[in-house]
Every structure is written in C-alpha cells, then in structure tokens.
UniProtKB/Swiss-Prot annotation:
Monomer. Its EC number is 3.1.1.29. Belongs to the PTH family. HAMAP family: Pept_tRNA_hydro_bact. This is Peptidyl-tRNA hydrolase. It comes from Cupriavidus taiwanensis (strain DSM 17343 / BCRC 17206 / CCUG 44338 / CIP 107171 / LMG 19424 / R1) (Ralstonia taiwanensis (strain LMG 19424)). The keyword Transmembrane does not apply. GO terms for molecular function: peptidyl-tRNA hydrolase activity; tRNA binding. Keywords: Cytoplasm, Hydrolase, RNA-binding, tRNA-binding. The record marks 10 as: Discriminates between blocked and unblocked aminoacyl-tRNA. NCBIfam families: pth.
Length: 198
C-alpha cells in the first residue's frame, strides 16, 4: 500500500519547466486527477494535498525546501501521519534513463541524486519506493560528449527540448496505472507493466 507520493523539484517559477522538476510534474498531474488542490503546509515544508486516487486516500507532497533538502519535508509529513518508508513513493528526474523512460524500484542507493540522499538520511533508510523519470543526460545531448559536473548541473536546471518534453509527458501518462497497482499493493504487476510499456 502506498500512502504518500512525493514529487521532487525546486520551488519557484524559474525552475518550473526544468528537467529537475519532473517529479513535481507528475504530482501536479495526480492532484488534477484526484480533484485535489496542493496547498502550502508550513509544518510539512511544502505543498501538500490528500487526494482520492485508485479508490483510496493518498497524500501528495511537493517539498518547498529546494531539492537538496527534500528529506525534511518528507519526514515531517510521514511522521505526522505515521507513514512507513515502504509506503512512500519518491518521484524524481533520472539522468541515467533516456527522456521518456520510467522505472520503478524499491530501495537502493541515491545514484548521485542529492534529493534522494537527503531523504534517505532523514528517514534513516533507503527502503522506500522510487519512480525514476528519465530526462536524458548531457553527454547524449547535441555536442554533449565528455560532459562534466558543471554540464550536468546546467542540464537539469534547463527545460527539456521539445521532443524530450513530449516523450517525458507521455511517460508521465504511462506511470499512472502502474502507480495505481503499486498503491493497491501489487508491486510486481506495477513494475512489469511500467517496464514493458512503450
């Protein structure tokens, strides 16, 4: 069972359309689906809403702490509502997947993602679900061979190219049904469906 879906990103209009905010995009989509309005919740350090999705109540959260401090928001809401780490899905951008790809997994390392590192540190475990939304990598972008750390930072803080955005939007749509399966406790089917989707 999933009780909390967290979208990672950075607050503010200047970051809204950037690759790093892919997690926010999916949570916004889920809020619309569930007829919920994300509101500022100071005690949870972000925008939060309780939505009716897949015939159950699910909390949605967009931390307003900036990406690298996302753990504070996640742990604040999870502790308040007694939500266990394995009842949490964190939705985030993933450079190691091509734009338009999506993968679901439970546990594992942060893979260099500072938002995940902070969440793991605050929860005291890596045993939570991650929905990885592919945004591509600067080394695969035009003229991107040999991309260094600075290129990576610039890449995630820029909007995707039009064809990438279309692929990412299609992936967001494909994630909805598998998330519903996961929320109802059918993790195996959720992963099988998402990982074979085209």
């Amino acid at each position: 069972m999933i009780k909390l879906i967290v979208g990672l990103g950075n607050p503010g209009a200047e970051y809204e359309a950037t690759r790093h905010n892919a997690g926010f995009w999916l949570v916004d989509q889920l809020a619309r689906m569930g007829g919920a309005t994300l509101r500022v919740e100071g005690r949870f350090h972000g925008l939060a809403a309780r939505a009716r999705l897949w015939d159950q109540e699910v909390w949605l959260l967009k931390p307003s702490t900036f990406m690298n401090r996302s753990g504070l928001a996640v742990v604040s809401l999870a502790r308040f509502y007694k939500i266990l780490p394995d009842e949490i899905v964190v939705v985030h951008d993933e450079m190691d997947l091509p734009a338009g790809s999506a993968k679901l997994k439970r546990g594992g390392g942060a893979g260099g993602h500072n938002g995940l590192k902070d969440i793991s540190a605050h929860l005291g475990t890596q045993d939570y679900w991650r929905l990885r939304l592919g945004v591509g990598h600067p080394r695969n972008a035009p003229g991107g061979a040999g991309a260094g750390r600075e290129d990576v930072v610039n890449f995630v803080l820029k909007p995707p190219r039009r064809e990438e955005q279309e692929a990412i939007d299609a992936a967001l749509d494909r994630c909805i049904e598998p998330l519903g399966l996961l929320a109802r406790g059918d993790a195996e089917r959720a992963m099988a469906q998402l990982h074979t989707a085209r």
